[in-house]
């Protein structure tokens, strides 16, 4: 991953790097790799995440169509 440093402004470059890493999911990946996760636990976690995503999407659709109050 690469970030340009303009006018020796390291703080701005660090912010840009953190934003890029956040978007790419690097922090989440590092957190997940802290400890070994058994394949069965990984499958269960991924399935639960998928269910959560589907429910969230359905909730957003319903809200957009005016079926659910905000």
Curated annotation (Swiss-Prot):
The keyword Ribonucleoprotein applies. InterPro entries: Ribosomal_bS21 (IPR001911), Ribosomal_bS21_CS (IPR018278), Ribosomal_bS21_sf (IPR038380). The keyword Ribonucleoprotein applies. GO terms for biological process: translation. PROSITE patterns: RIBOSOMAL_S21. GO terms for molecular function: structural constituent of ribosome. Disulfide bonds: none annotated. One of its GO terms (cellular component) is ribosome. It comes from Rhizobium etli (strain ATCC 51251 / DSM 11541 / JCM 21823 / NBRC 15573 / CFN 42). HAMAP family: Ribosomal_bS21. It comes from the Bacteria. It holds the Pfam family Ribosomal_S21. This is Small ribosomal subunit protein bS21B. PANTHER family: MITOCHONDRIAL 28S RIBOSOMAL PROTEIN S21, SMALL RIBOSOMAL SUBUNIT PROTEIN BS21M. Belongs to the bacterial ribosomal protein bS21 family. NCBIfam families: S21p. Keywords: Ribonucleoprotein, Ribosomal protein.
